[in-house]
């Protein structure tokens, strides 16, 4: 009977920005537990620009949750998606492992100029909104030109966080939502960089499960989902 139920379960495929990894997993679990009919939700995490390209090329997703508003709007303009919506506001954080001698909480972005810092991880600005936001704050602070040769680029913001966790970089500019995740919480020191990334989504035009996609989009706006997002620093205003 269980095998039959799984076989008959509706399926929802979500293309989601990497900063959502832990928050969205919690939201999916909460949503799935409330369903009366079998529902299989499959999130695929990556850089928003890469997911955007996959959807353009026909990847079978139902919902796109980007780390910006640009990519969803471009999909809609190209006829690949409909029904734009805002669901979160992301923030940048400067993060170092607990073992680092850098006092990032006190020094903030000036930590990046410390002589001990040889590699600084950011997400690739070519296709990751968090990478573009990192470059923007570095330029605004007037230190981008000084540290540009020290930058190492992660494929997405989650990989960027891994670089710093594993010693591939001395310090990283990553998503606050990842800093607050179970795998990073209490394992490092961070400075929240004044920033805000409006994060938007859309329903993919080719979705074969539009009604299910619309229901999940509705849940993202619920008090329960907003509470989960807020716990990861992703509260929308």
Residue ranges of predicted features:
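Exported/periplasmic ABC-transporter solute-binding proteins
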Residues: 9-36, 40-45, 49-59, 66-69, ...
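Bacterial N-terminal signal peptides
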Residues: 1-5
């Amino acid at each position: 009977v269980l095998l039959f139920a799984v076989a008959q379960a509706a399926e929802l495929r979500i293309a989601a920005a990497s900063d959502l990894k832990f928050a969205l997993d919690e939201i999916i679990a909460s949503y799935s537990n409330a369903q009366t009919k079998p529902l299989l939700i499959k999130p695929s995490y990556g850089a928003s620009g890469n997911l955007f390209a996959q959807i353009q090329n026909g990847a079978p997703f139902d919902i796109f949750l980007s780390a910006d508003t640009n990519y969803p709007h471009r999909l809609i303009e190209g006829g690949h998606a409909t029904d734009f919506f805002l669901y979160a506001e992301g923030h940048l954080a400067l993060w170092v492992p607990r073992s680092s001698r850098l006092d990032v909480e006190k020094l903030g972005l000036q930590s990046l100029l410390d002589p001990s810092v040889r590699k600084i991880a950011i997400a690739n600005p070519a296709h990751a909104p968090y990478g573009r936001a990192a470059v923007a704050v570095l330029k605004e602070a007037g230190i981008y030109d000084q540290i540009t040769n020290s930058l190492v680029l992660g494929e997405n913001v989650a990989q960027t966080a891994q670089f710093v966790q594993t010693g591939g970089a001395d310090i990283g500019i990553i998503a606050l939502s990842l800093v607050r995740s179970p795998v990073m919480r209490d394992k490092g020191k961070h400075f929240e960089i004044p920033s805000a990334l409006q994060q938007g989504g859309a329903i993919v035009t080719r979705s074969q499960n539009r009604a299910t996609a619309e229901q999940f989009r509705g849940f993202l706006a619920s008090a329960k989902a907003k509470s989960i997002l807020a716990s990861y620093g992703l509260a929308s205003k």
